[in-house]
Amino acid sequence: MATINQLVRKPRSMKVAKSNVPALEACPQKRGVCTRVYTTTPKKPNSALRKVCRVRLTNGFEVTSYIGGEGHNLQEHSVILIRGGRVKDLPGVRYHTVRGALDCSGVKDRKQSRSKYGVKKPKA
């Protein structure tokens, strides 16, 4: 235990919090260009073909982003918006693609949770 005199000379240092999404650089979203669109398999015990893409961001970072929802129109050179948020069963995937923004279309025929998938309110 430090004495009061030691603490006066050199106060206790604060722990520096590490960001979970370093490529965003404290921004809510970032724009980038798809360099590769592919599917990958999750870790045990799950089984699927998850849609992901490699993205070269405007700040020079190259990250992997998950494409949520059923079906997408992304291909190489598509310009997309990414946000933070990891995918628990895909190692190394720490970002999500924002559906319905820039070149990424919203999910077709989506009726519920539409705001998360970039879908306008259907005509009644």
From Swiss-Prot:
Per its UniProt record, what SUPFAM superfamilies does this chain match?
Nucleic acid-binding proteins
Domain of life assignment: Bacteria
Q: Which CDD domains does the record match to this protein?
A: Ribosomal_S12
Q: Which PROSITE patterns match?
A: RIBOSOMAL_S12
Q: Give a GO cellular-component term.
A: small ribosomal subunit
Q: Which UniProt keywords apply?
A: Ribonucleoprotein, Ribosomal protein, RNA-binding, rRNA-binding, tRNA-binding
Which Pfam family, any one, appears in the UniProt record? Answer: Ribosom_S12_S23
Q: What does the record give under GO molecular function?
A: rRNA binding; structural constituent of ribosome; tRNA binding
Q: Entry's InterPro entries?
A: NA-bd_OB-fold, Ribosomal_uS12, Ribosomal_uS12_bac
One Gene Ontology BP term is: translation
Is this entry keyworded Amino-acid biosynthesis?
Answer: no
Q: What function is annotated for this protein?
A: With S4 and S5 plays an important role in translational accuracy.
Q: How does it assemble?
A: Part of the 30S ribosomal subunit. Contacts proteins S8 and S17. May interact with IF1 in the 30S initiation complex.
Stated family: Belongs to the universal ribosomal protein uS12 family.
Which protein, by its recorded name, is this? Small ribosomal subunit protein uS12
Q: Which organism does this record belong to?
A: Yersinia pestis
Provide the taxonomic classification. Bacteria, Pseudomonadati, Pseudomonadota, Gammaproteobacteria, Enterobacterales
